[in-house]
Amino acid sequence: MSFSVDVLAGIAIELQSGIGHQDRFQRLITTLRQVLECDASALLRYEGRQFIPLAIDGLAQDVLGRRFTLEGHPRLEAIARAGDVVRFPADSDLPDPYDGLIPDQESLKVHACIGLPLFAGQTLIGALTLDGMEPDQFDVFSDEELRLIAALAAGALSNALLIEQLESQNMLPGSSASFEQVKETQMIGLSPNMMQLKKEIEIVAGSDLNVLISGETGTGKELVAKAIHEGSPRAVNPLVYLNCAALPESVAESELFGHVKGAFTGAISNRSGKFEMADNGTLFLDEIGELSLALQAKLLRVLQYGDIQRVGDDRSLRVDVRVLAATNRDLREEVLAGRFRADLFHRLSVFPLSVPPLRERGEDVVLLAGYFCEQCRLRLGLSRVVLSPGARSHLLSYGWPGNVRELEHAIHRAVVLARATRAGDEVVLEAQHFALQEEVSPALPDDSTPTLPANHNLRDATEAFQREMIRRALAQNNHNWAACARALETDVANLHRLAKRLGLKS
């Protein structure tokens, strides 16, 4: 069989008729699967010694969330090194990265596999993979015909990457486009609200505006901050992180602004604060709502005038720092309650971003699950970790109050459990490996009274009451310990100690 001019023209037309890069990539993959009569096809982007799926057809949806490292996938490494069409024999001892990931064929191993590396000049930018269940499925196609397919795909991918770079170049004066500069963050998701968030990040990244990132605990606010920094002119300089909720009041000012020798007991030498460390770069202040009003006033001065004073020093230091702040609280409500300065809120929220909770991201749950499955596979040295159809449905039906962080932990626990109950280095996650309903205690009604143990003495009753109060406060505050401490009107450090004594923390 050979390709007719009409077939090649049809592929080219599909590439031009798509709306946006993602649609064009999907049209290409779907058309190739039909023309080549393969069971699965994928277009992958190459970056940082790993392949990142851009479009798939005939593969499980979670493949789009996986990141295939060369070290962990010898077939993909062979494709990256080859420079030409790669045909893997049916009896190849190199594991196929898609084994177990073709729907309705999970228990079967892929037999026929072809890899087409994609180049822009001499630079590897991606690959096309074609897989079939029959050993001789692709024998009818010559290498020359497959090279034509690769050339069409490479042209589409290189144009998309170049446009992406030119768009970034417009926002970053002085930059120049090159394929080596393309960098993909780990913000996985194709749901409409995640695509909107990514678009907003692209808009604000090239500016020097301060950004307030809001969202529930575990949604990935730190990843948003990293994406903003990496897309900014400051990307060559440091991104410095500070968790405001973990700062004791006694050292918070020193952590932010530094101190000089002798400023207080224990200050045995000069020490730079986070603002100095982030000079010409970016400072990410996580849980900004936990700062005291006194520190908020000093932070406001830095944002207004660009100078800081180390603790114990009368001199001012000039700093050039972009501030990204994150919170899981409604700072507007905090302003009304007098717990957060209105002027600081307005300084920080010039360009506010809201990170959607996982329950509002639809199929992104499956993509993220694939990403975490691949992480576990590499970490535990397994040949494959896949989700059964039942497991996918189970994950999609759950509400994820702990968001992406809870999903990550759930996948890791499920892999360990499944591995312990099945011999070998292949793990298939089933619905029963996830005890999701038991992982998060439902919030009690506000007017409920904690149940006391029967035949209790005073100590048991007191501990039972404390335990239930803490559980209720945690559930009502998205399992954020600092917010829980505020709700219970107690010190967060004391709350941690009490929770450990009551068996609520390990």
Swiss-Prot record:
InterPro entries attached to this UniProt entry: AAA+_ATPase (IPR003593), GAF (IPR003018), GAF-like_dom_sf (IPR029016), Homeodomain-like_sf (IPR009057), NorR (IPR023944), P-loop_NTPase (IPR027417), Sigma_54_int (IPR002078), Sigma_54_int_dom_ATP-bd_1 (IPR025662)
The Gene Ontology terms for molecular function here are: ATP binding; ATP hydrolysis activity; DNA binding; DNA-binding transcription factor activity
Pathway noted in the entry: Nitrogen metabolism; nitric oxide reduction
The Sigma-54 factor interaction domain, residue ranges: 187-416
A Gene Ontology biological process noted in the UniProt record is: phosphorelay signal transduction system
Keywords of this entry? ATP-binding, DNA-binding, Nucleotide-binding, Phosphoprotein, Transcription, Transcription regulation
Q: Which Pfam families match?
A: GAF, Sigma54_activat
What does it do? Required for the expression of anaerobic nitric oxide (NO) reductase, acts as a transcriptional activator for at least the norVW operon. Activation also requires sigma-54.
Question: Entry's HAMAP family?
Answer: NorR
- Descriptive protein name: Anaerobic nitric oxide reductase transcription regulator NorR
Name the gene behind this protein.
norR
